[in-house]
Amino acid sequence: MENLEKMGVKVFEVDMDSVDEIANASIGVDCVVSTLAGLGDVIIDLQKRVLDGAIKAGVPRFISSDFSSDYNDLVPGENRNFDLRREFKKYIDSTSIKATSVFNGAFADILQYNTPILNLKDKSIGYWGDKADWELDFTTMDDTAAFTAEVALDDNAPRDLQIASFQISPNMILADVKEANESRF
């Protein structure tokens, strides 16, 4: 917090269960950026309180805690995390605030943590069905932060912003791994 304060950022300690405290901390703000992570008690319940506080304070714009793949056209019920975001989206879209969702695909840093898409430990690359050539969106944290900052400053920001630092398919990942690593995948 000290580094933020040195840069001129005003830091407020608030009770996140209190819409009134959130509202008081949001007075005079042009945009609230929600960067929450969690399950229903966070993505829906807590984020609703943050949104309600922003609305009570007269904040005109809100960026929700999406920062994920675009779930709008995905089948409800297939992914819990997308379903939580979809439920919050219904709520925010029923309010008067101008909302933006940033859809950045996956954060690029997951490629270094032995996830199903790239598991260096098990020497495996995963994909669904016949999707080995399907290019996935990945965005770095820095790019996500930069685009989010731009949206926060833009009165005409779109409802949904799609971004990606790069797109890569499982077959492209395999080719890159083979080139960089002599072991077999």
Describe these PLM feature segments.
Residues 26-35, 63:
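N-terminal Rossmann-like NAD(P) cofactor-binding module of classical short-chain dehydrogenase/reductase
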Residues 60:
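Short acidic/polar active-site loop segments enriched in Thr and Asp
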Residues 9:
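Short, structured active-site "lid" loops
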Residues 14:
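Cofactor-binding loops of NAD(P)H-dependent oxidoreductases
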Residues 1-6, 17-20, 25, 39-42, ...:
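Oxidoreductase cofactor-interface core, primarily capturing Rossmann-like NAD(P)-dependent enzymes
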